[in-house]
Amino acid sequence: QICLESTMEYSRFMLWFEKEVQKIVKELWNQHFIIKLTLSQLHFRETILFLEHLKDFSKRITIEFIGEDTPEIKKHFSVQEQEAFFIGKLRMLKKWKFIISKHIEGCSVEQTLAFTPCLHEIKYTMSQQARMEENIIDLHMFIDFWEYWATHKKLKFVVEVKEKDFITKSLMHKKVHVQFENA
């Protein structure tokens, strides 16, 4: 977040990050990697150059988008203009053969539905607070909806959890694809 407020800092960070990612991707040639970005980072030239320079490794990289905040300098664009911009960038990344994943928590349903043709995977991270606040039946209905949507649109749907608790076990019992955080 700090880097996004200073273009110079962000530029330096992305150059450093690119070198590190290139080094790791070359060394670990048989591994698949996940790079987490916010959608707002797609507004920056440095992000696009970073991803363009990784095109040779794109089939081994998942770009996982989290959040949907808009940088202050782009707030004058309408929701539709923002959506069109992001769809264009996501299509470009898909054309470059990156695997595109989008977190659905903390963003609008409309945005996720609009981005669906550009995605390979939708992901829901179940936080401890959400588990405690949610009625298990409501949670299962929520999961069922997104699982149905993903199946209908030929996407992978992943529920990311921190540990094996009762709710996690009930999801596994339903055959939902559960991924443990940092796994």
Model feature map: region roles:
Residues 1-53:
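Bacterial c-di-GMP phosphodiesterase EAL domain
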Residues 55-134, 149-182:
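The catalytic core of metal-dependent phosphodiesterases that act on cyclic dinucleotides
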Residues 14, 145-148:
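PAS-family sensory domains
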Residues 11-15, 37-46, 70-74, 109, ...:
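Acidic-and-aromatic substrate-binding clefts and catalytic sites of carbohydrate-active enzymes
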Residues 18-22, 45-51, 79-88, 107-111, ...:
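Leucine-rich repeat
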